[in-house]
Amino acid sequence: MSGGKYVDSEGHLYTVPIREQGNIYKPNNKAMADEVNEKQVYDAHTKEIDLVNRDPKHLNDDVVKIDFEDVIAEPEGTHSFDGIWKASFTTFTVTKYWFYRLLSTIFGIPMALIWGIYFAILSFLHIWAVVPCIKSFLIEIQCISRVYSIYVHTFCDPLFEAIGKIFSNVRISMQKEI
């Protein structure tokens, strides 16, 4: 990091969070403005999307890739007319393609809104409730763990050490009689 910008491995220039730029009411953006003219600035919250490969992490490889042959199959000896088979293939493929497009047109944006809200709530709860609750619990349980540790070292350690010394002299010998 240098001079109010982040540069990633591809050479993209990212803006620095406002607190690292100086006073939030008077950020020192003049020096940064001169450097911005050299490279294109990318905001950390915007991202280019790939319109060709829409599943770059392969989330739906095993679930959604269903073709005609995966659903409908005629065994040897039981074949319909070739024209019927071709028409069935075309009907299945076109119906699946256009019905998916229709459903995504109607429900895609509302579902994206619902899932966006859901994951925003989930992130908010994790950041502002779960992690602080766990940290609080760990701080509160620390005194109990100290008492438990003292108990174990005072009572259990000597007991098990004595039992270990008792059984340390036990020897087993096996003889095979003929």
From Swiss-Prot:
Subcellular location(s) per record: Golgi apparatus membrane; Cell membrane; Membrane, Caveola; Membrane raft
Lipidation (S-palmitoyl cysteine): C133, C143, C156
Matching InterPro entries: Caveolin, Caveolin_CS
GO cellular component, as recorded: acrosomal membrane; caveola; caveolar macromolecular signaling complex; cell cortex; cilium; endoplasmic reticulum; endosome; focal adhesion
Superkingdom in the source lineage: Eukaryota
Primary location class: Golgi
N-acetylserine, modified sites: S2
Region of interest called Required for homooligomerization, as start-end residue ranges on this chain: 2-94
Function: May act as a scaffolding protein within caveolar membranes. Forms a stable heterooligomeric complex with CAV2 that targets to lipid rafts and drives caveolae formation. Mediates the recruitment of CAVIN proteins (CAVIN1/2/3/4) to the caveolae. Interacts directly with G-protein alpha subunits and can functionally regulate their activity. Involved in the costimulatory signal essential for T-cell receptor (TCR)-mediated T-cell activation. Its binding to DPP4 induces T-cell proliferation and NF-kappa-B activation in a T-cell receptor/CD3-dependent manner.
Protein name per the record: Caveolin-1
Organism of origin: Oryctolagus cuniculus
